[in-house]
Amino acid sequence: MCSRGWDSCLALELLLLPLSLLVTSIQGHLVHMTVVSGSNVTLNISESLPENYKQLTWFYTFDQKIVEWDSRKSKYFESKFKGRVRLDPQSGALYISKVQKEDNSTYIMRVLKKTGNEQEWKIKLQVLDPVPKPVIKIEKIEDMDDNCYLKLSCVIPGESVNYTWYGDKRPFPKELQNSVLETTLMPHNYSRCYTCQVSNSVSSKNGTVCLSPPCTLARSFGVEWIASWLVVTVPTILGLLLT
């Protein structure tokens, strides 16, 4: 993340450990699961099934059947899940492979007991794409009498994410945590590298820009200049090539 020999970057790496790929919460018979797209998912309940139940059915939303177990065999219905699901009749678990955002829904497992009564459990599944690697744009950088005015923007396409900016060893204050970092750096709070971490519930990615004191761009990763000099440089180079 930083050039070799910068010990402070080791501390920063510890702050940027990856997030878990699965987030689960339970409220009564409603289970919330958040998973990353492309992963394999197991929908199951935390309690044992009723003894000697007669029938077990998994639904996608409230009326579309995915699979039904009855008379010691499983019937898989025509749906977008066919070929991607497998039922374990012993536990009631439903295995789904390669989930996508289109699989977001409330899944219902309904069990018909031998008494004739029904019992059901609901699992609300949210599938999120992993966040892309952000690009840091240097909006402005200016040396101001031993201080450094810095304005950076952290850009990713069309995503609802959380932003966290880090200096060498610690995050910036909460009030600075958004897609744009605008701050004046003084000698006592100067950092060599500035990292933007974008994250959602299932993934995180980082982009980093590094400076040389007092206010000069050094090595960077995922950084982009908003530079007007390109407009001048490109025609100049073309002119030289044609002469």
Swiss-Prot record:
<feature type="glycosylation site" description="N-linked (GlcNAc...) asparagine">
    <location>
        <position position="40"/>
    </location>
</feature>
<feature type="glycosylation site" description="N-linked (GlcNAc...) asparagine">
    <location>
        <position position="189"/>
    </location>
</feature>
<keyword id="KW-1003">Cell membrane</keyword>
<feature type="glycosylation site" description="N-linked (GlcNAc...) asparagine">
    <location>
        <position position="104"/>
    </location>
</feature>
<comment type="function">
    <text>Glycosylphosphatidylinositol (GPI)-anchored cell surface glycoprotein that interacts via its N-terminal immunoglobulin domain with cell surface receptors including CD244/2B4 or CD2 to regulate immune cell function and activation. Participates in T-cell signaling transduction by associating with CD2 and efficiently bringing the Src family protein kinase LCK and LAT to the TCR/CD3 complex. In turn, promotes LCK phosphorylation and subsequent activation.</text>
</comment>
<keyword id="KW-0336">GPI-anchor</keyword>
<feature type="glycosylation site" description="N-linked (GlcNAc...) asparagine">
    <location>
        <position position="162"/>
    </location>
</feature>
<dbReference type="InterPro" id="IPR007110">
    <property type="entry name" value="Ig-like_dom"/>
</dbReference>
<dbReference type="GO" id="GO:0006952">
    <property type="term" value="P:defense response"/>
</dbReference>
<dbReference type="InterPro" id="IPR036179">
    <property type="entry name" value="Ig-like_dom_sf"/>
</dbReference>
<comment type="subunit">
    <text>Interacts with CD2. Interacts with CD244; this interaction is possible not only on different cells (trans interaction) but also on the same cell (cis interaction). Interacts with LCK.</text>
</comment>
<dbReference type="InterPro" id="IPR015631">
    <property type="entry name" value="CD2/SLAM_rcpt"/>
</dbReference>
<dbReference type="GO" id="GO:0045121">
    <property type="term" value="C:membrane raft"/>
</dbReference>
<feature type="signal peptide">
    <location>
        <begin position="1"/>
        <end position="26"/>
    </location>
</feature>
<dbReference type="GO" id="GO:0098552">
    <property type="term" value="C:side of membrane"/>
</dbReference>
<keyword id="KW-1015">Disulfide bond</keyword>
<dbReference type="GO" id="GO:0016020">
    <property type="term" value="C:membrane"/>
</dbReference>
<keyword id="KW-0732">Signal</keyword>
<dbReference type="GO" id="GO:0006955">
    <property type="term" value="P:immune response"/>
</dbReference>
<dbReference type="GO" id="GO:0005886">
    <property type="term" value="C:plasma membrane"/>
</dbReference>
<feature type="lipid moiety-binding region" description="GPI-anchor amidated serine">
    <location>
        <position position="220"/>
    </location>
</feature>
<dbReference type="GO" id="GO:0048018">
    <property type="term" value="F:receptor ligand activity"/>
</dbReference>
<feature type="domain" description="Ig-like C2-type 1">
    <location>
        <begin position="29"/>
        <end position="127"/>
    </location>
</feature>
<feature type="domain" description="Ig-like C2-type 2">
    <location>
        <begin position="132"/>
        <end position="212"/>
    </location>
</feature>
<dbReference type="Pfam" id="PF07686">
    <property type="entry name" value="V-set"/>
</dbReference>
<keyword id="KW-0449">Lipoprotein</keyword>
<dbReference type="InterPro" id="IPR013783">
    <property type="entry name" value="Ig-like_fold"/>
</dbReference>
<protein>
    <recommendedName>
        <fullName>CD48 antigen</fullName>
    </recommendedName>
</protein>
<keyword id="KW-0964">Secreted</keyword>
<dbReference type="InterPro" id="IPR003599">
    <property type="entry name" value="Ig_sub"/>
</dbReference>
<keyword id="KW-0677">Repeat</keyword>
<keyword id="KW-0325">Glycoprotein</keyword>
<feature type="propeptide" description="Removed in mature form">
    <location>
        <begin position="221"/>
        <end position="243"/>
    </location>
</feature>
<keyword id="KW-0472">Membrane</keyword>
<feature type="glycosylation site" description="N-linked (GlcNAc...) asparagine">
    <location>
        <position position="44"/>
    </location>
</feature>
<dbReference type="InterPro" id="IPR013106">
    <property type="entry name" value="Ig_V-set"/>
</dbReference>
<dbReference type="GO" id="GO:0070062">
    <property type="term" value="C:extracellular exosome"/>
</dbReference>
<dbReference type="Pfam" id="PF13895">
    <property type="entry name" value="Ig_2"/>
</dbReference>
<dbReference type="GO" id="GO:0030101">
    <property type="term" value="P:natural killer cell activation"/>
</dbReference>
<keyword id="KW-0393">Immunoglobulin domain</keyword>
<feature type="disulfide bond">
    <location>
        <begin position="154"/>
        <end position="196"/>
    </location>
</feature>
